[in-house]
Amino acid sequence: MSEQDFREIARNGLWRNNPGLVQLLGLCPLLGTSNSTVNALGLGLATMLVLACSNAAVSLVRGAVSEAIRLPAFVMIIAVLTTCIELLMQAWTYELYQVLGIFIPLITTNCVILGRAEAFAAKNGVLRASFDGLLMGLGFALVLLVLGGLRELLGQGTLLADMHLLFGPAAADWKIQPFPQYQGFLLAILPPGAFIMLGLLIALKNRIDESLAERAKVQAGDVPATQRQRVRVTGVIE
């Protein structure tokens, strides 16, 4: 796989075709667990691992699975990998596993994972499929993390609270409280706040894309005549 392929897959996963901001897949866990940084990071990492491993596994068996049973086979692969992640979390981060609850098993039914298995992994080699899964998972995890951080900051006035649930006792002092007297904003950590914050993130991304597209047109010289500035003989722009 060429360097250009790597860059294209990275751009798609992290920005142009981001699962959370563009495809709008996996909204149930995205909105349900993003009320704090630690919850968002925990589920994001779990989803990223399952997505990368499932893409690799699907790519390996794609030639041995018939068209008739392809989707059930893919779901079984995803379910096995999700169970492995679930067991690891029970062993190493049990308190966080209890907090996330049903959202860990629900990784099996996450449309992001099944969608990439069907649309990409089943049609590409192991290396491309693994990298696509890793970058799509990373893009999803980053949206989760940003959303969780913003909601925690607005809702509780803290950042990185309870990180010991994921990283152990050494992370107990990671908590940041920028505004000690802040009383919190309850709406931010409730489901309606999740919808509002996600909508704002999507709007911000769309605005950035529009600005980049306009800049590219200007640099390419493809600007409508009505928008061009007239330049006098003196060289001064009107």
Swiss-Prot record:
Record localization: Cell inner membrane
A Pfam match: Rnf-Nqr
EC number, UniProt record: 7.-.-.-
Residue intervals passing through the bilayer: 41-61, 71-91, 95-115, 130-150, 184-204
Any one Gene Ontology cellular component term annotated for this protein: plasma membrane
One BP term from GO: electron transport chain
Record's bilayer topology term: Multi-pass membrane protein
Keyword field: Cell inner membrane, Cell membrane, Electron transport, Membrane, Translocase, Transmembrane, Transmembrane helix, Transport
Described function: Part of a membrane-bound complex that couples electron transfer with translocation of ions across the membrane.
Record-stated family: Belongs to the NqrDE/RnfAE family.
Record-linked PANTHER family: ELECTRON TRANSPORT COMPLEX PROTEIN RNFE (PTHR30586), ION-TRANSLOCATING OXIDOREDUCTASE COMPLEX SUBUNIT E (PTHR30586:SF0)
Subunit structure: The complex is composed of six subunits: RnfA, RnfB, RnfC, RnfD, RnfE and RnfG.
Protein name: Ion-translocating oxidoreductase complex subunit E
Protein's organism: Pseudomonas aeruginosa (strain LESB58)
Gene giving rise to this polypeptide: rnfE
